Amino acid sequence: AGHEVQVSDLYAMRWKAGYDADDSGAPPVGEFWRPTLDSKQAFAQGTQSADIVAEQEKLLWADTVIFQFPLWWFSMPAIMKGWIDRVYAWGFAYGVGEHSDRHWGDRYGEGTFVGKRAMLIVTAGGWAEHYSPRGINGPIDDILFPIQHGMLFYPGFEVLPPLVFYRTDKTDAGQFADQCAALAERLDTLWQTEPIPFRRQNHGDYLIPSLTLRPELAPGQSGLAVHLRSE
């Protein structure tokens, strides 16, 4: 489809998953190591470790970011979560924008990655029915909510519906060909696909500073689905 691609193969890169004081390249802020303040200082002063900077540059370069991973214990593998922990620095992916009685930071629909799109490609060993609305594992959209809403929408990405493949350890050649075709179709239509309609934090749907949904919106309802626009 003519896309230019950069790949971060975390296992091949031997990516360091744990964020620690060595990532800042500078003395810790204060007597005790405080990860958020350490991250803020390192990003502001340009002392982050080189591997973190390289991944941040990829994010700024891309117009679409795709996270592909197996579903391990209802989430992404630790190495990818560690990528988020280290690359999403204060001042880069969070801690941006003003905080006032009308605007609570640039996040949840605003932020560094506004204008960019993100999508998950997930492989799961269980059946699709296991992840259905009444399935034993819970709905797949609920399982992926902390990633799609909390890790992607939070810093500003428009989040596309995920592409999930089930029973992947039982995939035969014909099914694999179908999966490849489904993936190709999604890649060809990245910019025509409607994003998940998450509510934006600072656009009137939430009370500030409590950040609770206004009572007149989805009255009497609770749960993750209330954070989706219904109109």
Region locations from a protein language model:
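Basic, glycine-rich
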Residues: 165, 169-172, 185-188
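Short aromatic-enriched loop/helix-cap "lid" or pocket-rim segments at secondary-structure transitions
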Residues: 17-22, 131-133, 174-176
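Short, glycine-/small-residue-rich phosphate/pyrophosphate-handling segment
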Residues: 95-153
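Well-ordered beta-strand positions
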Residues: 64, 117, 161-162
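Generic structural signal for helix capping and beta-alpha/helix-loop junctions
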Residues: 15-17, 128, 169
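N-terminal beta1-alpha1-beta2 submodule of the flavodoxin-like/Rossmannoid cofactor-binding fold
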Residues: 1-96, 181-231
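Short beta-strand elements in bilobed, periplasmic/extracellular small-molecule ligand-binding domains
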Residues: 5-8, 158-166
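C-terminal/domain-terminus segments
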Residues: 1, 136-141, 173-181
